[in-house]
């Protein structure tokens, strides 16, 4: 490879073995870090070096300083939770360390899992990107939140019974919004989460793309409820 000195790459295999390489001709600051083989700290590498480790590989070039990659590595190593959330936290930490010398413009997040896409139709568990924005990491975080809302299943901790108070919050929407249908979601107030109300709420949620969070057991996803009400409040 005659262009080896201009390249930078990081890899982690299915067994957690990590490697990072930074070419000699990459622009300063340039380098990478991988998780330590003994799971304590991380291993740093500079230009012309291949470094080997475990669990993650973080690398960058044209950075303000090495603090960007240092922050990313430390954030990922210390964080818990889902992989998308940990990667998002690492991006934020990296930017807080200085980021790109040229400023901010774009950001992307790709997480692949077998059958992890919508309804298992593909392997793109998360595939979002921001091409041009004043604060691309903040915008990426907003898009990740939307992606999780519409494509991730309900967290059982977010379930709550549909009380008469919640029915009163949702019925005006179901009674007034046709959303392109020949009739409203509800034709008359129900006052309680009976079968008629639940069927109307189900159809409404499918229409609004909350497909993976639809339920018919008298409970509602708190995150969905908050999103529905926030959208209507913003529209008035």
Task: Please annotate each region the language model reported.
Residues 156-236:
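Short acidic, glycine/serine/threonine-rich helix-capping segments at coil-helix boundaries
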Residues 1-164:
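N-terminal nucleophile
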């Amino acid at each position: 490879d005659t262009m080896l000195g201009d390249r930078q790459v990081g890899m982690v295999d299915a067994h957690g073995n990590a490697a990072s390489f930074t070419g000699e001709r990459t622009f300063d600051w340039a380098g990478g870090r991988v998780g330590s083989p003994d799971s304590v700290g991380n291993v740093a590498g500079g230009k012309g070096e291949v470094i080997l480790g475990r669990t993650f590989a973080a690398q960058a070039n044209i950075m303000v300083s090495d603090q960007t990659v240092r922050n990313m590595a430390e954030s990922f190593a210390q964080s818990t939770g889902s992989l998308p959330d940990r990667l998002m936290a690492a991006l934020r930490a990296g930017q807080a360390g200085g980021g790109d010398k040229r400023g901010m413009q774009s950001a992307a997040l790709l997480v692949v899992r077998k059958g992890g896409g919508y309804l298992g139709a593909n392997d793109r568990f998360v595939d979002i990107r921001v091409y041009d924005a004043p604060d691309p990491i903040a915008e990426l975080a907003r898009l990740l939140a939307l992606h999780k809302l519409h494509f991730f299943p309900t967290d059982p901790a977010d379930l709550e019974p549909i009380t008469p108070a919640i029915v009163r919050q949702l019925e005006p929407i179901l009674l007034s919004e046709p959303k392109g249908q020949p009739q409203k979601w509800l034709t008359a107030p129900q006052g309680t989460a009976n079968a008629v109300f639940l069927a109307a709420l189900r159809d409404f949620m499918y229409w609004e793309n909350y497909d993976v969070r639809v339920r018919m057991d008298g409970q509602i996803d708190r995150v969905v409820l908050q999103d529905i009400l926030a959208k209507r409040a913003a529209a008035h």
